[in-house]
């Protein structure tokens, strides 16, 4: 329970969500800091004791107390809602609901509720006695007797229930009997309660809306920062809705009357619908700019904002809310509505139809018993499933135990031949994939088979782990010369074979034999069997290194496509190498020839060219991971043979000596290797590969990989110890680089490694001398530049990776639940209408220079006076360091009676930051704005009011616009409003739009404005300059308007009767602030009164003497016209 509806804010910086004095209550707290909060402890306040006290008080004094009846109803509704029953009279439907409480499936009686019910009956008796003197004495006595009998029977039955052991059966039997006997009494009580409630709702709609007991509670957590801003129910308590004023992008505004203030004054309340998370601080939203600005602005020409608060939608009258919010509530899309449906599970079932069924009740024994039993059974089943279900973390082990005998070892041709495909039921697919990883696909065997196989699996796994630690490379079987099988490797390093040709019967026999042996013998003992078997049969042995394998990666490949497939060949030991046929012996001879003498390379190439057709079936394609201009080519092969170059057509080398790309024969696929090191073959002048080198660095007895190395980096690190730059027939530089590091073979290959290392050491000495002569100074410069370029690329890559990690972490943030709230702003109610309606009214003239005049004794037109008030309001707004940013006639209000102007709708208000403003405008080139072009696309519009809309209204915004605008943007908008005031009424919207657009782009105005209203035209040009720094401030404009509207210059004012004498019967006494000096009526010379006034002040001559001659001339020419 929340302690308070409205929480108070501590004054100080310690509070994280500190909000400055937005309301009157907080202003009082700021002044009088001695105010201390006192919270009511609800445990100390017992409702039952209070109700007992009131009933006893009524018994003694026998006086009518309406508060008692209201509290009794409130208490009944609260208890019914807590128990999950209907809030409208369900207490009286079930007779034994008060005496029995349900806790799961156990039921027990409570004596305290009996006393409460007796108190309620006593209260009813007292009520009946009150009205006994008036009417219906006999009826009341009968009802009282029935109630007394009912209470006695109920007490007796409750005592009998306590003595019984089986609570459930007695409870249901008693409930059935009570429903049969007292059904008529309960029906009468329900009908009376419903009738009374309907009468109240029909007579008093406002009272029902204000009854907070009918409204749901708040669903926002009380600990959330959002709860500090809530004042649920404040609108219904203090205001009464009258009518809708208007709706816009920021919300809807209603005219309301204040109930609590004397005279019930009227205000305007704006409703703004927000979707906010529980952790969001509402005061940081853009809507609160309007609140913060109006809190400090006290101006006659600015709409005042009094206070603000937040409420949840369910606490507000729904007819005031927009249709969007009403639809959300109806469709249960909001979070608070979902919780309401959970609390009202049984509300629909609790409503009893008394007119149709006489023997019905809220909960019949049969329906209630069936619902309880079904729920209880479901709970039992759920508990059993939970107990029987294994730990989900070990689900893989459970599946492996069930599928163990089918998945341990398998023959290579089982499930792959055409015969097996024809009979899928008999011969199932042995390969384990993600799709068929279930018990339904593999047939189960007996339980003892599962246990025995799973126990053996664990032992095998432990042995495999030990063997993997000892061995650095896994053992793999060489292919047969006849091409019966070929070995391939999938992405996870698992081994499988691909069937190629005949001998099906023999392979099945060998496969079954291996399965039987592997159940009995460990994996390491199979090496003995390999010695016994022949060379052809030795290839049929299959090692299942991992029980899991992807069936999608293991597919049949025919003999026709073998030349195009990638095969990895690794040498187990020297015995396997010598065991190959003549073709393989030829390869070993070629390798020994390369190790013995460097000069034998040419001869080896010729021999390999002769045997090219015979070796195509067993050749290996070199796999390349990355080919870049500055990086080394990575070839995923540990021991490549020199004859592998026959599959490569073209080998191109960059000018820097780097491998750029290769053209391969056949299909290119990168096969990842368990050993992650980069192996590169060096190139001879004739295009042959020399011995391999690995870009590795020996540190502490271990080799560490050097990735993305360039020639410059390898030269600097000393990795490339030897290299050649020679030219072929085309003049392309090719590099020979040789570096040898010990191969990672088994313990049996140590002798071969020592022999190879001796040969390597001899070659290093010879090639070092040649490398020094080959590298020139020009090549060294190229290597250095490449090294620096790679550093810059690495930095860029690192920055990109960091940014990607930040983006991923941002996307992975857990979403916070959002709640719907309504922000309410209490504002000053402006009488009249907007300036837009005032300008477009039908009584306004559509002819030039036909201005309006008020009833007051005013020397100038009303349009000029309204503009003066507008500039005064902007001056007050800018003085408090705020910018309106959305100044237009729609946001300006005019009173019909007093003709006072007020600026409203500060929803886009912004704080002025002078330091940022000066820096920003120095870097911006201002330009003219054209609505029809795409010039506005370059504007900075980071602070957007509505989705997809530029700040402010496009027709009145300044050219700079966006987030960098300052208070001079309001001056630009005021200049356009002045132009609209000087022009007559526009007949169409397009005419107004064209007039404003011409001024924005070309500064064009009508001729009568230039000639007859020249000072105002000059003022408009100054206010609408493209550079904001050149525009005058609001204070400067206000001072200039004062001079133009100076009442001392009325004697020399120009009258509109001189121009349009035939259209005006009575010329008004007004000013256009000009002096007309004419010799003839056809010639007009306009002279500014401002210049005349300055001359008079400088010469220190009175105005009457200085201009006496001019006045006399004007009077003579105009024949007694008004001054």
Swiss-Prot record:
ATP binds at residues 245-253, 270. Residues 678-1049 form the Protein kinase domain. Gene3D superfamilies: Phosphorylase Kinase, domain 1, Transferase(Phosphotransferase) domain 1. Transmembrane segments: none annotated. Residues 743-754 have a biased composition (Acidic residues). Residues 1-30, 409-493, 572-609, 742-800 are annotated as: Disordered. Residues 21-30, 419-428 have a biased composition (Basic and acidic residues). Disulfide bonds: none annotated. It holds the Pfam family Pkinase. The keyword Zinc-finger does not apply. Sequence repeats lie at residues 576-582, 583-589, 590-596, 597-603, 604-610. It catalyses: L-seryl-[protein] + ATP = O-phospho-L-seryl-[protein] + ADP + H(+); L-threonyl-[protein] + ATP = O-phospho-L-threonyl-[protein] + ADP + H(+). One of its GO terms (cellular component) is nucleus. SUPFAM superfamilies: Protein kinase-like (PK-like). Its EC number is 2.7.11.1. GO terms for molecular function: ATP binding; eukaryotic translation initiation factor 2alpha kinase activity. It comes from the Eukaryota. One of its GO terms (biological process) is negative regulation of translation. The active site is at residue 886. Residues 576-610 are annotated as: 5 X 7 AA tandem repeat of D-K-N-[GE]-L-D-[GD]. Residues 455-477 have a biased composition (Basic residues). During the asexual blood stage, phosphorylates translation factor eIF2alpha in late schizonts resulting in protein translation inhibition. Plays a role in trophozoite differentiation into schizonts. Belongs to the protein kinase superfamily. Ser/Thr protein kinase family. GCN2 subfamily. May form oligomers in response to stress; oligomerization may result in catalytic activity. Interacts with BIP; the interaction is disrupted in response to stress. This is Eukaryotic translation initiation factor 2-alpha kinase PK4.
């Amino acid at each position: 329970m929340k302690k308070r509806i409205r929480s108070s804010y501590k004054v100080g910086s310690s509070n994280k969500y500190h909000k400055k004095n937005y309301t009157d209550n907080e202003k009082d707290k700021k002044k009088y800091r001695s105010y201390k909060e006192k919270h009511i402890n609800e445990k100390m306040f017992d409702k039952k004791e209070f109700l007992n006290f009131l009933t006893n008080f009524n018994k003694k004094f026998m006086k009518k107390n309406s508060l008692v009846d209201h509290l009794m109803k409130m208490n009944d509704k609260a208890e019914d809602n807590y128990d999950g029953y209907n809030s409208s009279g369900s207490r009286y439907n079930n007779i034994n609901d008060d005496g029995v409480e349900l806790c799961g499936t156990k039921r027990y009686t409570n004596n305290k509720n009996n006393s409460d019910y007796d108190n309620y009956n006593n209260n009813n008796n007292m009520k009946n006695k009150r009205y006994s003197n008036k009417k219906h004495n006999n009826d009341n006595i009968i009802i009282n007797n029935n109630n007394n009998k009912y209470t006695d029977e109920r007490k007796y039955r409750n005592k009998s229930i306590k003595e019984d052991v089986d609570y459930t059966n007695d409870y249901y039997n008693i409930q059935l009997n009570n429903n049969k006997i007292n059904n008529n009494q309960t029906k009468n009580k329900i009908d009376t309660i419903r009738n009374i409630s309907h009468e109240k709702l029909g007579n008093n709609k406002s009272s029902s809306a204000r009854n907070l007991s009918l409204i749901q509670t708040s669903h926002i957590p009380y600990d959330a920062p959002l709860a500090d801003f809530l004042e649920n129910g404040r609108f219904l308590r203090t205001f009464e809705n009258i009518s809708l004023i208007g709706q816009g992008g920021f919300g809807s505004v209603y005219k309301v009357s204040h109930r609590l203030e004397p005279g019930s004054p009227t205000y305007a309340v704006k409703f703004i619908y927000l979707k906010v998370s529980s952790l969001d601080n509402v005061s940081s939203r853009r809507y609160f700019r309007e609140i913060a600005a109006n809190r400090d602005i006290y101006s006659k020409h600015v709409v005042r904002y009094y206070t603000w608060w937040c409420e949840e939608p369910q606490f507000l009258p729904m007819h005031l809310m927009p249709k969007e919010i009403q639809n959300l509530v109806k469709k249960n899309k909001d979070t608070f509505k979902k919780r309401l449906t959970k609390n009202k599970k049984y509300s629909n079932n609790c409503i009893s139809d008394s007119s149709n069924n006489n023997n019905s009740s809220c909960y019949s024994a049969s329906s209630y018993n069936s619902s309880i039993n079904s729920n209880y059974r479901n709970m039992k089943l759920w508990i059993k499933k939970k107990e029987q279900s294994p730990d989900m973390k070990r689900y893989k082990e459970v599946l492996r135990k069930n599928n163990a005998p089918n998945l341990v070892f398998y023959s290579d041709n089982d499930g792959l031949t055409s015969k097996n495909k024809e009979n899928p039921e008999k011969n199932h697919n042995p390969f384990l994939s993600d799709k068929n990883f279930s018990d339904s696909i593999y047939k189960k065997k007996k339980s003892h088979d599962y246990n025995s196989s799973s126990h053996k699996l664990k032992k095998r796994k432990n042995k495999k782990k030990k063997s993997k630690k000892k061995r650095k490379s896994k053992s793999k079987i060489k292919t047969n010369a006849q091409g019966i099988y070929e070995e391939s490797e999938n992405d996870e390093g698992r081994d499988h074979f691909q069937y190629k040709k005949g001998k099906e019967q023999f392979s099945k026999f060998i496969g079954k034999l291996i399965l039987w042996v592997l159940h009995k013998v460990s994996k390491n003992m199979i090496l003995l069997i390999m010695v016994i078997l022949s060379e052809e049969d030795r290839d049929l042995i299959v090692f299942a290194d991992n029980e899991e394998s992807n069936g999608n990666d293991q597919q049949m490949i025919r003999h026709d496509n073998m030349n195009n497939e990638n095969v990895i060949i690794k040498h187990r030991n020297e015995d396997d190498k010598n065991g190959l046929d003549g073709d393989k012996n030829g390869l070993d001879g070629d390798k020994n020839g390369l190790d013995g003498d460097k000069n034998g390379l040419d001869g080896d190439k010729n021999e390999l060219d002769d045997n090219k057709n015979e070796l195509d079936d067993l050749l290996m394609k070199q796999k390349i991971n990355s080919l870049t201009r500055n990086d080394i080519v990575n070839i995923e092969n540990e021991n490549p043979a020199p004859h592998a170059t026959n599959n490569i057509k073209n080998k191109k080398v960059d000018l820097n000596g780097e491998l750029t790309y290769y053209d391969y024969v056949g299909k290119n696929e990168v096969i990842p290797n368990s050993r992650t090191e980069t192996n590169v073959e060096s190139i001879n002048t004739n295009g042959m590969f020399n011995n391999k080198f690995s870009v590795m660095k020996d540190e502490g007895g271990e080799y560490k990989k050097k990735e993305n190395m360039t020639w410059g980096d390898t030269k600097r690190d000393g990795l490339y110890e030897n290299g050649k730059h020679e030219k072929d027939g085309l003049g392309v530089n090719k590099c020979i680089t040789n570096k040898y590091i010990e191969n990672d073979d088994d313990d049996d290959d140590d002798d071969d490694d020592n022999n190879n290392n001796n040969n390597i050491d001899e070659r290093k000495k010879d090639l070092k001398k040649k490398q020094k002569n080959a590298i020139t100074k020009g090549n060294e410069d190229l290597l250095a530049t490449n090294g620096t370029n790679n550093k810059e690329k690495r930095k860029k890559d690192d920055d990109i990776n960091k940014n990607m990690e930040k983006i991923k972490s941002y996307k992975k943030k857990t979403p916070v639940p959002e709640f719907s709230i309504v922000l309410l702003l209490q504002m000053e109610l402006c009488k009249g209408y907007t300036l837009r309606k005032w300008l477009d009214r039908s009584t306004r003239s559509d002819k030039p220079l036909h201005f309006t005049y008020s009833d007051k004794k005013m020397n100038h037109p009303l349009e000029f006076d309204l503009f003066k008030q507008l500039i005064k309001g902007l001056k007050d707004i800018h003085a408090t360091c705020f910018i309106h940013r959305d100044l237009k006639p729609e946001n300006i209000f005019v009173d019909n009676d007093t003709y006072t102007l007020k600026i409203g709708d500060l929803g886009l208000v912004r704080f002025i930051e002078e330091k940022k403003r000066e820096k920003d405008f120095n870097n911006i080139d201002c330009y003219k704005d054209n609505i029809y072009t795409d010039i506005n696309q370059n504007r900075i519009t980071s602070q957007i009011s509505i989705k997809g809309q530029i700040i402010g209204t496009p027709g009145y915004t300044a050219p700079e616009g966006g987030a960098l605008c300052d208070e001079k943007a309001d001056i630009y908008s005021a200049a356009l409003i002045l132009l609209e005031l000087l022009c007559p009424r526009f007949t169409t919207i397009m005419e107004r739009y064209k007039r404003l657009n011409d001024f924005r782009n070309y500064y064009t105005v009508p001729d009568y404005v230039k000639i007859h209203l020249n000072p105002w035209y000059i003022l408009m040009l100054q206010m609408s300059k493209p550079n904001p720094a050149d525009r005058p401030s609001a204070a400067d404009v206000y001072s200039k308007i004062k001079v133009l509207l100076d009442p001392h210059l009325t004697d020399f004012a120009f009258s509109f009767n001189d121009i349009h004498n035939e259209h005006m019967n009575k010329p008004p006494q007004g000013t256009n602030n000009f002096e007309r000096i004419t010799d003839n009526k056809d010639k007009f010379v306009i002279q500014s009164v401002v210049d005349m006034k300055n001359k008079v002040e400088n010469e220190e001559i009175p105005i009457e003497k200085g201009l006496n001659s001019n006045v006399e001339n004007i009077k003579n020419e105009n024949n007694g016209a008004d001054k």
